[in-house]
Amino acid sequence: GPMTGLFGDSELIEMRDDERLDTSRIEPYLRENLFKSDAPMSFAQFGGGRANLTYFVRCGDDEYVVRRPPLGPVAASSHDMKREHRVLSRLWRGFPLAPRSFLYSDDVSLIGAEFHVMERRHGFGIRPDLPNDLRGDTDTCRRIGEMVIDTLVALHSVDPHSVDLDSLGRPEGFAARQLNGWTKRWHAAKNTDLNDFD
């Protein structure tokens, strides 16, 4: 179908009023630390997303994504931009499908929170609302499922040492930590008592 949205891109919207970036602060920072260019810079917001706020930045012909935690209080470990940057600034070397993160900042005076800037990759998330041209075709759905599995196998085949990520994380006790963490998040966020969840 026809492209809609900002810059002819259906993923992009005008920045929401309450989620607007202060471009007057971040633009000089990006020019000094990443772009090294005085080409025109434009900003928009990605309309989708599930938690973190994601913004589009174009400088000349180059496209980037700025990611920051959501507004309001967040659990310290659930939106760790520094960790996300650390992983994505290295993982692409052993897993070329990963977008490369170029820049991390913990200077909250720039946009109100820590953030990182990564390359933009075009595509779509595998969710129940697949693009219309991929719905209902059993063969296409099977091929997508196989591609997802193959991609996960390739990701899990990356040797952490080879991409300088061997000191990341604590693999021992992962499942117990996840269960404990999600239980705490549930208790912090619930507004209805559902005994079956406890």
Segments from the language model and where they lie:
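Juxta-kinase regulatory segment immediately upstream of eukaryotic protein kinase catalytic domains
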Residues: 4-37, 41
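ATP-binding pocket architecture of kinase catalytic cores
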Residues: 38-198
